[in-house]
């Protein structure tokens, strides 16, 4: 997700013992490059990103986590798994714009 949306910001703090989770929609993706091939290393996130209501949430989109998150083999070889906590901390302009467009035109979720 972060590869295709440059305005998304990752946490990048020192990871703790908490294991990152992925939702049904994001299941099987590499957290860094969105690749579906060769999952290799388990994702660790910082304690702040796994605290309170954020516990067990998807690392990429914030949905309900159903499976463990993994880095792909290529990101592990390039040592991108050592850059810090990979949790996305902001919404990004696409989701923010969608929210305000819905509000502006009065669309409601079913």
Curated annotation (Swiss-Prot):
Where does the source fall among the domains of life?
Answer: Eukaryota
InterPro entries on file: PHF5
Question: How far does the signal peptide extend, from start to end residue?
Answer: none
Q: Which GO terms describe its biological process?
A: mRNA splicing, via spliceosome
Membrane-crossing segments per the record: none
Q: Which family does it belong to?
A: Belongs to the PHF5 family.
Name assigned to this protein? PHD finger-like domain-containing protein 5A
Q: What is the lineage of its organism?
A: Eukaryota, Viridiplantae, Streptophyta, Embryophyta, Tracheophyta
């Amino acid at each position: 997700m972060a590869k295709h949306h440059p305005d998304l910001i990752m946490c990048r703090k020192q990871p703790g013992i908490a294991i990152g989770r992925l939702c049904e929609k994001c299941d099987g993706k590499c957290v860094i490059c969105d690749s579906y091939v060769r999952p290799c290393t388990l994702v660790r996130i910082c304690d702040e990103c796994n605290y309170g209501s954020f516990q067990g949430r998807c690392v990429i989109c914030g949905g309900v986590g159903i499976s463990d998150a993994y880095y792909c083999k290529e990101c592990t070889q390039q040592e991108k798994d050592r850059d810090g906590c990979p949790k996305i901390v902001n919404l990004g302009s696409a989701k923010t714009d969608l929210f305000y467009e819905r509000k502006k035109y009065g669309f409601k979720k079913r």
